Amino acid sequence: MLPSNFNNCQVSLDDALKELQELKSSNELDFEIRIVREITDREECLDMVLGTNLPQGSELENGKLVDLVVGIKKNETTDTIKETEYELYLQKLNDKNLTDLNLLTSPVFGTSNVNQLIENQELITYIKSENPLNYKFLFSEAQGIIYGVDEKNNVIKLLDISIKTVREKESGLHTFDFVKFDSSNYLLLTYSGTDGNYYLSAFELLPENEVGDEIVLIVFELQNDNNVHFGGKILQEEDNLFLCLGDLNSPGNSAKFDSPWGKVMYFNKNDLFETPITSHDDPRINYIVYGLRNPWSCFEHNDKLVIPDVGSIHWEEVNILSNYLNAEEPVFLGWPWLESYFDANYKNTPVDEQTKQNQLENAVFPQYTYPHANDYCAIIGGTELFSSEKWDGYFFIGDFCTGTIWAINVEKDSDIVVLEKNIVPFSITTINDSGNGTLLVGTTAGSILEIILP
């Protein structure tokens, strides 16, 4: 039975954990324990249990989830909570024999050098080196502007749609790419519009690096006044365009097919230029993945689809899908029922119980994961390096809060840290290929960094 004093700061986090572990041992129970931080102004409640997700006196049973809500100061978490959290996360991984998947234990490989190429811009959302405009690279800002950068690192404005979008949390301009249609080159981009819609649009590239008028290829209605969990990454394969979308902060979207959110889809690009897609049930849409929460990026790697999915409050995921175009049914990646390998404690019912069970039975789990511990918070993707023999077979992902960057080679079962935490003084937002064997990294502070790998 859940102790009656697990509320109103009557018991410390350490004592609560000891008591729960004793209950597990003495009663041969197997239930999950998590720590949930909650900001409090009460000094006496720091590192103390404010409450739980269960009514006091609840029966503790196998499979139950116990969330210990612990008081913290705003923007300050004590070492006690950090250490205890990480120990709990390690125990969860150990219980499922998953410790090898934890990226926080990856060894450090050499020392990378960091050069600042661009500074004093707005939040960077995407960077691309390969382009038909002869720029060294281009980058986008969340506020709705795309720039080209020449060989002297001069920044030249290419497109400004800031009147159509707004930077608010994760809303704004998300990504861009280039596509050829009827012998003309087009700039593609995704953005959340101020009119309550989400757009995949094209702009023809004209002489003198001018761009034509907007051609809407896809428009999806946004739900409510949402400003997070868009995704928006564009991929290409022959005549197909792929779009990776988040759940719009409505987890049920990811489990059902009455909206495009929380999914990866593809469609023939030629059809879009003739008639835009305006509904999630347009027959031209091919859904291939669902069960996503907030994929800031997705990318192809050695004929695989890599989807780093930002977790809720506990776990980050690296999903790697083989033969993703040949699956008979869309692949389910777990959300909202699972966060990584673990119960997400989602209680709403977007689908019936039988559908939920079928989804759980067929869920595909991430190949790598890491917990929200030791200041790590959100997974950022991602790229491979196409012009580097040394790093052939690897792809690169990072963590938003710490600036850590990992290199992963699935075939060699190798995951290593190539940029240690806290070297980059800003939160990183995107990791891309420079075309010269180095990484280009964007930040929330409007900087673009070149990472010269060891």
Cite the ranges covered by each PLM segment:
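Structured segments of extracytoplasmic/periplasmic soluble domains
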Residues: E19-N27, G57, G71, Y126, ...
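Beta-propeller domain segments
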Residues: E87-L98, P132, S171-L173, D247-I416, ...
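Extracytoplasmic/secreted envelope proteins and their assembly/folding machinery
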Residues: L13-L17, G231, W261
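Short beta-strand-to-coil "C-cap" segments at the C-terminal boundary of structured domains/repeats
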Residues: G71-K74, L205, N268-K269, L321-S322, ...
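Second-shell loop/turn segments in exported
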Residues: M1-Q10, T77-D79, V108, I163-K164, ...
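Ligand-recognition elements built from short beta-strands and adjacent flexible loops
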Residues: M1-E85
